[in-house]
Amino acid sequence: ENVGAHTLVGEGVGARAAQADPLANPTTEADDIEIFGYLGTKSTAASPGDSAKQTAVKVNNLTGETGVKAYAKTYASIESTSAEQKTYSVKINGFTTGNFVISSGDVESAVDAINQVSGSTGVTASSSNNKIVLFDSDGDDITVENLQTLDGFSDLRVSKLGEDGLVSNVVG
């Protein structure tokens, strides 16, 4: 008999450097997700560009046949590498924040600005150790674009976070 709860945490694709056309997740049409549950085993196709949310939906469509239920959450962080306070604006999932001031020792203005657009982005922000922690509870991808184009404004670093909050990939 199979009794108990099992958790599989997949860290997914790391943060990517800025570019005109974002990269899709590195899967091919031939990739399958195999689901081994107490009710049975099933496979579902993984598609290029699937978010964690889309993958969880595919797994959950087979819950009745496998007994496996999936959830998806997405975490990322933004930090400034400059001790000097600078004014930025960013796009989160295509929605522009208001201007905020950020430094390596102060992120509260940025957290407030990001949370002002959270109803549109699905991403909430909090602060931890002078970093902005971004969270999407549905597992949608989180995109961040620095809108400040002046010289000397390249201090923001975006990192992919695992569910444990630890940095697993840095871009910037």
Role assignments for model-derived ranges:
Residues 1-172:
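Long, low-complexity, repeat-rich, intrinsically disordered, solvent-exposed domains used
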